[in-house]
């Protein structure tokens, strides 16, 4: 009787487990179907429900982890994606599934790349590559090479972009990362070509072209993007075709072939309109506006910048609006329409204040100052020292010859404030005023050079600006407060400069977390309590207790980071039918870690230290209507280079230096002799 009862109980338990297994698998399959249909959020709900039900099948659970990680990655919840891909990796290693371990390592590497943990991502992707080669899995090897190339590309781009350098002018470590990406993409390309995978070839060509572009290899970038364009047309992939046209336009800009670049940007604009992507349409208009600025066709530049402005306003992209107003102000200035230029400069200033763009605010103020000088208006924040009796001589109208197109990016002459379309100034007045009418980009360069320096007083700032000025003023200064040699050195400018510097200092400060006691009595009372315990062990000659304490603390921290089978959600173990699974899990926990584990541990510890460092101020946010590859900075840099080329380098004469050094020595000796004789 008892035997029959035990048998009935076992049968009932089996049926319950069977229903649970079926329920878990059904939920997982429904989640997979929803994710494939594009509804990842609903799919995640079914996968989470499957995990709640649980399963004894480790391979099924591993597949659920992988799908959950991918779904969370698609939803941009990278912390959750990292968690489930880590569970998948742990489980795959536990059951000895090398193929599953390779895939989990690749997924983990992609997630770490997005989070900016590039060194850890490289370790994971390299593990994916090593296992694929061990298994002779060519498809997996190609995918691992592509992922590893993406990590190096992202690492180089991330470390190289914040600086003011030109494309291709990067530090050695950045160039090494980008070159490693090129090598990996080329290896991937040869492998997928042998496999006959045209879609993978297209992706490889696109990324290869982008990396060559960053390295400054613009001809190689053009070749790669042309191949990408060809494959995109084969598949009818309009989005990829549009990206290829845009990338080709960017490359031709830096080759100085502006006409060719404009043709590719027009094709980009056409496809963006076909795809009904308003943000990309605005980006194309913005790029075309800048291209025609480089071609000095300011009428067309204004037309495209106005289109960009309209779409930015439609999409409520204030950053894009500000950039459009800046560009329009420069173009109208070049045409001599200073009233319109003033309008857009004021709008640029207003938007820069609204979005907290201090650099844009400073640039807008300088542009307004320039335009007010041209129009003979008084400066809004201070009394201008420029007279309003400007004489205009009509006989000089049209005397200036229009500059031809320049192909060299080093010698561009753009955004003139006094083009030939404006009635020219009297030659004498023009000679006096022309040095004062500085280009916005030149002034911006000058202020950027001052950014990192400390100024002890306002007078010191004034002296630096006066020495650097090229302005001419024949009036003698009546007081120290009058600064007639440089109209930009006024109080409003210095107020802005001081605020700009203070904000930069605030961005570099560390913010203390938690409640801190600030009173001296509280600090005095708290200090002995805090220092009492460590003072005994540290000061004592016998530091064994301290080292034991440190070792135990470190071991607890390491234990917290270990993966245990009890922490795997959805894993159900029973005494009856899974002793082998439990034994494998326990055996896996007791294994001695290999050298690869310690390499990963060192990198992880290094990244944890990096996470505790003070991050630099974040880069300015870009709006959706401003393209990532914004070459408007090229216009500013070309202006800055022209200013640098006009500087005079003083050559030191060693004979003269020694002569002056001898004179100074003799004078000092004579002074000492005079003092001694007086005594």
From Swiss-Prot:
Which Pfam family is one of this chain's hits? TPR_7
**UniProt-annotated binding residues for GDP:** 608, 613, 642, 647
Q: Which InterPro entries match?
A: GoLoco_motif, GPSM, TPR-like_helical_dom_sf, TPR_rpt
Q: Does the keyword Oxidoreductase apply?
A: no
Q: Residues annotated as region Important for interaction with NUMA1?
A: 22-357
Tissue-wise expression: Detected in brain and liver (at protein level). Detected in brain, spleen, liver and testis, and at lower levels in heart, lung and kidney. Enriched in the ventricular zone of the developing central nervous systems. Expressed in proximal colon, ileum, ovary, Sertoli cells of the testis and granular cells within the cerebellum.
Q: Name one GO biological process term.
A: positive regulation of spindle assembly
Key word Glycoprotein present in the record?
no
SUPFAM superfamilies in alphabetical order: TPR-like
List each copy of the GoLoco domain by range.
490-512, 543-565, 594-616, 628-650
Q: Whereabouts are the TPR repeats?
A: 24-57, 62-95, 102-135, 142-184, 202-235, 242-275, 282-315, 322-355
Q: Where in the cell is it found?
A: Cytoplasm; Cytoplasm, Cell cortex; Cytoplasm, Cytoskeleton, Spindle pole; Lateral cell membrane
Q: Name one GO cellular component term.
A: lateral cell cortex
Sorted alphabetically, the keyword list is: Cell cycle, Cell division, Cell membrane, Cytoplasm, Cytoskeleton, Membrane, Mitosis, Nucleotide-binding, Phosphoprotein, Repeat, TPR repeat, Transport
Report the outcome of residue 210 to F.
Nearly abolishes interaction with NUMA1
Entry superkingdom: Eukaryota
Q: Which family does it belong to?
A: Belongs to the GPSM family.
Q: What is known of its domains?
A: Each GoLoco domain can bind one GNAI3. In the auto-inhibited conformation, the GoLoco domains interact with the TPR repeat region.
What is the protein's known function?
Answer: Plays an important role in mitotic spindle pole organization via its interaction with NUMA1. Required for cortical dynein-dynactin complex recruitment during metaphase. Plays a role in metaphase spindle orientation. Plays an important role in asymmetric cell divisions. Has guanine nucleotide dissociation inhibitor (GDI) activity towards G(i) alpha proteins, such as GNAI1 and GNAI3, and thereby regulates their activity.
Q: Which PANTHER family match?
A: G-PROTEIN-SIGNALING MODULATOR 2, LD33695P
- Put simply, this protein is called G-protein-signaling modulator 2
This protein's encoding gene: Gpsm2
